[in-house]
């Protein structure tokens, strides 16, 4: 939808690749993605082909990436995994701290619901449909631009404040899975491994060392509990299991290092 990207460009989203446009500031990268759903997804969700969502999100360079991803090709034989183990741990540990393409990563995302546009039955509030004629397409385009201007830009501006960011992480509800509720999601809630990890690294960044220490210690406790349970239940076996193990061990090491830094920096 060229009109939408043109509107985004006026707001500073000068970089674009595929369905994503982004804008860099001193503290974060604001990302806007128009996600058109595949035919198979449309069939699964019982929405018409041509349905899409707008997905605003933010990337913060001081937060660790918690997206494990694929570490090796599917063709790699199990006999060779042990040879790659130490190498992969180092790779993931570095990857947790440094992301080469931050525009492809997001830490906090916002849910935006439509106000107008062609009807879909059943009516998912956060999915638009381009319709079957020019009038419907214009109506949808105008609504998407309006929601971006009235809500997405407010979301981006709100999270410019690091104090507001850490308040969100510590106090707000993650609205993941809430079909009718607008808000911020994908930070896991304030007592999850993800939420505690993000809170700890953000607090460290703004030199709130007491909050950072408490959050990261709780995060580490939860991670160690998870690690022990997975070990006991043989959930770290096979390719996928070993990938998960490598990632969990690397995240544990990363948090332990950050806690060591706090001991040195804390006044």
Predicted regions and their residues:
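Amphipathic alpha-helical segments
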Residues: 1-17
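Intrinsically disordered, low-complexity regulatory regions enriched in serine/threonine/proline
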Residues: 23-267
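A short acidic/basic microdomain associated with nuclease active sites
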Residues: 12-28
């Amino acid at each position: 939808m060229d009109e939408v990207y043109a509107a985004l460009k006026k707001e500073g989203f000068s970089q674009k690749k595929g369905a994503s446009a982004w804008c860099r500031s001193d503290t974060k990268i604001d990302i806007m993605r128009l996600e058109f759903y595949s035919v198979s997804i449309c069939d699964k969700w019982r929405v018409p082909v041509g349905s899409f969502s707008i997905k605003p999100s933010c990337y913060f360079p001081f937060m660790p990436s918690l997206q494990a991803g694929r570490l090796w090709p599917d063709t790699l034989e199990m006999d060779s995994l042990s040879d790659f183990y130490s190498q992969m741990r180092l790779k993931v540990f570095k990857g947790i701290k440094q992301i080469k393409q931050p525009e492809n990563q997001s830490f906090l995302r916002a849910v935006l619901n439509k106000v107008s546009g062609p009807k879909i039955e059943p009516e998912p509030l956060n999915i638009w449909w381009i319709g079957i004629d020019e009038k419907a397409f214009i109506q949808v385009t105008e609504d998407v631009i309006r929601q971006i201007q009235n809500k997405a830009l407010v979301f981006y501006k709100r999270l410019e404040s690091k104090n507001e960011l850490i308040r969100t992480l510590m106090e707000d509800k993650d609205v993941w899975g809430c079909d009718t509720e607008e808000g911020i999601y994908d930070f896991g809630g304030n007592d999850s491994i993800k939420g505690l990890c993000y809170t700890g690294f953000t607090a460290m960044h703004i030199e709130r060392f007491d909050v950072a220490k408490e959050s990261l210690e709780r995060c580490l406790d939860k991670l160690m509990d998870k690690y022990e349970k997975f070990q006991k239940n043989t959930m770290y076996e096979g390719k996928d299991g070993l990938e998960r193990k490598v990632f969990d061990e690397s995240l544990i090491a990363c948090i332990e290092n950050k806690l060591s830094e706090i001991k040195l920096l804390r006044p």
